[in-house]
Regions:
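Short beta->alpha junction loops/turns
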Residues: 205, 293, 345, 349, ...
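Amphipathic, well-packed alpha-helical segments that form the structural scaffold of globular domains
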Residues: 183, 187-194, 217, 390, ...
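P-loop NTPase Walker
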Residues: 2-34, 38-41, 155-158, 163-279, ...
């Protein structure tokens, strides 16, 4: 094994290390030539303007995918095959494929079948590989490597200094990929077939978010043509989280996946109907919980279909000198047959004129005429038929329907009869009736209802694959909104029931998968933590018997590093300033996690450069968030983030800020598990009883 810590700017004395460094330089040069060839492609050679635009877009994406970041290693491993189809060959495994001028691979994509043994092979099952090599890098320069023999009887290493160093590498900036450190149990999930929906119950630090993103990258590689047509969507809990994970897929060469929040999805539906509509308020917890209840789907369906009007009289269609009649009873039968088809409201409405016209056509044939399809089409388009159809089957604006439902007590009572109690109906009604969708006081839960109503009217097109993170915090109605985006596709569901911090969130994965429309999905548990130090996760796990008694406690693989300090102080903010002087002297990122109410006082007291997570509301806006070494993090936004060093203020206030103690303890569990190297807890009030005695220093 070559030393992983060899200085990158000195000439290596190890010939093998020198050879690997030359291969890295040659591979970078080859990648540059690949990009030059892509840049030289001329879309003007296309036969027409449309083709030229398509080719130019394709070439631009190709050039972007071939961009090289000199600080990121082109490869991180090597496989030397001894048996099978690749016997005698060696392959360098990296984030993307790189080939020389003759097309021979210099680096193979980590997602290629030939790379699979890098993640799965063992001494017991070597998969044809004799040697697995891992590389150490510093700022993109190759500094060393270590070899692991997989030949039977040679004694497999179960410890990798390079692997541990990569896992523990200090974090500054947004989330990075884990492609060099994917573990076998993670890789099984990453490479699950596109047709299979998976649910990952992952304890803190098990890499569930990274696994979900790498699964998206793998599926885009393995099913590129299909998913380029159908689309891949990543749904995160908030804009700050999307900023944090936003660089992972591009770093893996994937730029085709769309990333958004659930609010982005449903508000997109609302504004597509009424461009001036916007979220203007937040619901109280009990109201939001009721609006997120699955029973609201029945209420909305009742409201949508209540618009059908029984015919008061028959249809009369003048044509030439004749007047053709469809009696009211027959029109009612036609409406009932369309309703029984089980299609969307809007689709059935579009069929009605043709069905009425066909009834007229039958009358013509019975009278001895010989009409054809052209006559039926003309009758269906005629003014009497269109007007009659519009009367029986009025158009429905989903936003106006929900606005009426939340403003009109009588309309709500009719739609919710037998579904919601009178008390629940009263809770749903807005304090002041809305006037128009563009100016209505919509909440996020209201927008979810509009999204449901819109799907009842016209089917939401399905994507090929959807990844939803922090799924445990979504209500049944929110999960239905995600699920209909993958009605004919598959999903990757990520979350941790112990970290559920919304009163409307689901309490079991079986329920969540049912709401997503994927009850057949298998739940995979990740309990081996690679990020959170052992003593930190054990301290946080004291809360599990109360917040998630059915879950297995996480086990950290990191026993040699990490630091936990719990200190009672007379005054929080002065103590924080003193602690930060010490923590900022260390290497790595620092997160100060505070109850939301303390963000202002803490920010005012800090005299060192810092950023505030969540300070930029627009996910697309430029921001220093996560680019600073020091971030102040409201507890409500801590989920999914990680920092080398975390300073957590006043757990008691953090718990008390939530609607109930259970939610507060779950929020505390989230905040306690954000640290990669050290956790310092400062408190002036007594710690919550569930944390037990203070750990010995």
């Amino acid at each position: 094994m070559s030393s992983p810590s060899a200085a990158p700017d000195t000439e290596p004395t190890d010939p093998a290390l020198a050879a690997e460094q030359r291969h890295l330089a040659d591979a970078r040069a080859a990648l540059a030539r690949m990009r030059d060839r892509a840049a030289a492609m001329d879309a003007a050679a296309a036969g027409d303007w449309v083709s030229a635009q398509y080719l130019e877009s394709t070439f631009a994406l190709r050039r972007k995918a071939l961009a090289d970041d000199p600080t990121v290693p082109l490869f991180f491993g090597r496989l030397d095959y001894a048996d099978g189809d690749y016997a005698g060959e060696s392959f360098h495994v990296g984030r993307r494929h790189v080939s020389d001028d003759e097309g021979e691979p210099m680096v193979v994509d980590w997602r290629a079948p030939v790379s699979l043994p890098f993640y799965r092979a063992s001494a017991g099952e070597p998969m044809g590989v004799a040697l697995r090599r891992r590389y150490g890098f510093l700022h993109g320069a190759l500094t060393g490597f270590e070899d692991e023999s997989l030949v039977a009887g040679t004694g497999q290493r179960d410890y990798s200094a390079i692997l541990e160093a990569e896992i523990e590498r200090p974090r500054v900036g947004p989330m990075r990929d884990i492609v060099a450190t994917i573990q076998p149990e993670q890789d099984v999930i990453v490479r699950a077939d596109l047709s299979r929906s998976v649910c990952v119950q992952g304890a803190p630090g098990t890499g569930k978010t990274a696994v979900g993103l790498h699964r998206a990258a793998y599926l885009l590689y393995a099913h590129r043509d299909q998913l380029r047509r159908q689309g891949v969507l990543v749904v995160g809990p908030n804009a700050s989280f999307l900023r944090y994970i936003g660089d992972v897929l591009p770093a893996l060469g994937e730029i085709d996946a769309r990333q958004t929040t659930l609010a982005g999805l449903v508000v997109g539906t609302l504004t597509s109907l009424h461009p001036k509509a916007a979220l203007r308020r937040e619901d109280p917890a009990d109201v939001a919980t009721l609006k997120g209840d699955e029973r609201m789907a029945t209420v909305l369906a009742n409201a949508v279909w209540s618009g059908l009007v029984p015919p008061a009289e028959g249809l009369v269609v003048p044509r030439g000198a004749s007047r053709w009649r469809v009696p009211a009873w027959q029109a009612e039968e036609i409406v009932a047959s369309l309703r029984a088809r089980g299609v969307r409201y809007g689709a059935a409405r579009a069929m009605l004129p043709q069905r009425l016209a066909h009834a007229v056509l039958v009358k013509m044939e019975e009278a001895g005429d010989s009409p054809d399809d052209r006559v039926q089409d003309a009758v269906a388009r005629s003014r009497p038929v269109r007007a009659y159809a519009d009367t029986l089957w009025p158009a429905v604006d989903p936003a106006r329907l929900v606005l009426r439902l939340l403003s009109d007590a009588d309309f709500l009572a009719t739609a919710a009869d037998g579904v919601l109690t009178p008390e629940e109906q009263a809770l749903l009604l807005w304090p002041r009736p809305g006037r128009a969708p563009g100016s209505a006081p919509w909440s996020l839960a209201d927008a979810v209802l509009v999204d449901e109503a819109a799907d009842l009217v016209a089917r939401e097109p399905s994507l090929g694959h959807v990844v939803v993170d922090e799924a445990q915090d979504n209500s049944p109605m929110m999960l239905r909104a995600v699920g209909r985006r993958a009605s004919t596709g598959s999903v990757t569901v990520l979350g941790d029931l112990a970290q559920a911090t919304t009163p409307w969130g689901v309490r079991s994965w079986a329920a969540a998968l049912a709401h997503l429309g994927k009850p057949e999905a298998v739940v995979d548990q990740l309990t081996r933590g690679f990020r959170v130090p052992g003593e930190v996760i054990e301290f946080a796990a004291r809360l599990l018997p109360l917040i998630a008694p059915d879950l297995e406690p996480p086990v950290s693989v990191r026993r040699t590093r990490g630091e936990l300090v719990v200190t009672r102080v007379p005054a929080l903010v002065p103590a924080l300033v003193g602690v930060l002087d010490e923590v900022l002297a260390r290497v790595g990122s620092v997160g100060v996690i505070v109850p939301d109410a303390l963000v202002g006082p803490v920010v005012d007291a800090l005299e060192v450069p810092h950023a505030v997570v969540g300070s930029s509301p627009d996910v697309e806006s430029a921001t220093v968030e996560f680019d600073s070494r020091l971030d102040v993090v409201p507890a409500s936004l801590a989920k999914g983030l990680e920092f080398d060093h975390v300073v957590l203020l006043e757990p008691a206030d953090l718990v008390a800020a939530e609607p109930d103690e259970l939610t507060g303890l779950r929020r505390l569990y989230v905040c306690l598990t954000r640290a990669v190297t050290s956790l310092t807890v400062l408190h002036a009030q007594p710690l919550p009883d569930a944390l037990g005695p203070v750990p010995a220093a």
